[in-house]
Swiss-Prot record:
Subcellular location as annotated: Cell membrane
Ranges that cross the membrane: 10-28, 35-57, 72-91
Protein's name according to its UniProt entry: Uncharacterized protein AF_1598
Paired cysteines (S-S): none
């Protein structure tokens, strides 16, 4: 089941909690993507240097597999890594579209 979330609320909570909500959001989205067929490893890798880069790649790979089939996982990984502030907007927008379709 995909949860529709407000982008404004996502960013406001992320700012107010000094980024902690973004980590919570990543955990929730990872669970949703995995339930839809992605294979994203445990979020504990987020707190381990270097392993967090691997985790982000696997997240991008899962995002592409579930929501953007046929597109490049490497492109999304680089986008998420280099311009990380827009990553939640991209991912949540796609999840919201899926939720509206009933996915």
């Amino acid at each position: 089941m995909v949860t529709k979330r407000s982008l404004l609320k996502l960013y406001l909570l992320g700012i107010v909690t000094l980024g902690i909500y973004f980590i919570y959001w990543l955990v929730m989205v990872k669970r949703e993507l995995n339930s839809l067929g992605a294979n994203i490893p445990t979020c504990w890798l987020l707190i381990i240097p270097i392993a967090n880069i691997y985790w982000l790649y696997k997240f991008a790979e899962g995002f592409v597999k579930v929501l953007k089939p046929g597109e490049s996982a490497v492109l999304y990984f680089l986008l998420f890594w280099l311009v990380s502030i827009i990553m939640p907007a991209i991912v949540q927008s796609e999840l919201n579209k899926l939720a509206e379709r009933g996915g």
